[in-house]
């Protein structure tokens, strides 16, 4: 059943020995569409279209059984005029994602003609899930940042550090989700290696999670270990 939510070996110097990763990332595919509302349309129209599309197209086949939709509305960012909303489609694999795209191309014409938005950017990504919030999900919130690793550091090392950080954070009451997102075709070019996603099952929990970080996690050994691998994170935005 499609879910709709409102609201991505190191060689040792001189030794040439392989270093095993502490954790094995589980990758999934995700498609991000930045949208502008057509004249006279708003978020309610987009939400209604998504629900209607589920009923009239997606539910008619098992191709979308593992497909999940998330809608974002930008709240904080450097340019809130760039787009009005983001449609995120989550898939377990590239095979399922492109099978879904193929079905939509062949069978989604009538629904596509009624879409209340124009797409201004479409990005194909891979995502590594680090942690996920527990409990029933409501209207949530997500913070994105473009991050660059220090020279000589690879993504698996950063993932290991994020996992250790998330495990330690949970012991302090943290209930936030985290992902490393690797943008592909359609991505905005820039000096970054991945996009970091920090998300909460409710808007309020993103705020309480931030307070918990500064009170209980900042400066911990896991926090320092993570910072030792990351050169910088920038272009923070919240939806």
What is each of the regions a protein language model found here?
Residues 1-8:
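Sec-dependent signal peptide recognition
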Residues 18-239:
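Short S/T/G/P-rich N-terminal loop/turn motif that feeds into the first structured element of a domain
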Residues 9-18:
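Hydrophobic h-region of N-terminal signal peptides that target proteins for export
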């Amino acid at each position: 059943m499609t879910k709709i939510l409102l609201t991505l070996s190191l060689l040792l110097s001189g030794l040439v020995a392989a270093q095993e990763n502490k954790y094995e990332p589980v990758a999934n595919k995700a498609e991000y569409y930045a949208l502008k509302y057509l004249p006279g349309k708003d978020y309610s129209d987009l939400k209604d279209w998504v629900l209607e599309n589920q009923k009239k197209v997606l539910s008619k086949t098992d191709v979308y059984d593992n497909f999940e939709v998330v809608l974002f509305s930008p709240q904080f960012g450097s340019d809130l005029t760039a787009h009005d909303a983001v449609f995120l489609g989550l898939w377990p694999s590239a095979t399922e994602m492109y099978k879904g795209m193929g079905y939509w191309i062949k069978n989604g014409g009538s629904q596509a003609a009624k879409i209340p938005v124009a797409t201004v950017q479409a990005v194909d990504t891979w995502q590594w899930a680090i942690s996920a919030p527990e409990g029933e999900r409501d209207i949530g919130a997500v913070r994105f940042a473009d991050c660059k690793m220090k020279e000589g550091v690879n993504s698996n090392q950063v993932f290991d550090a994020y996992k250790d950080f998330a495990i330690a954070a949970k012991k302090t009451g943290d209930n936030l989700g985290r992902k490393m997102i690797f943008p592909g075709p359609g991505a905005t070019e820039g000096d970054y290696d991945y996009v970091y996603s920090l998300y909460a099952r409710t808007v309020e929990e993103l705020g309480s999670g931030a307070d918990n970080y500064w009170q209980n996690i900042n400066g911990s050994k896991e926090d320092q270990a993570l910072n030792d691998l990351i050169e910088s994170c920038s272009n923070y935005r919240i939806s």
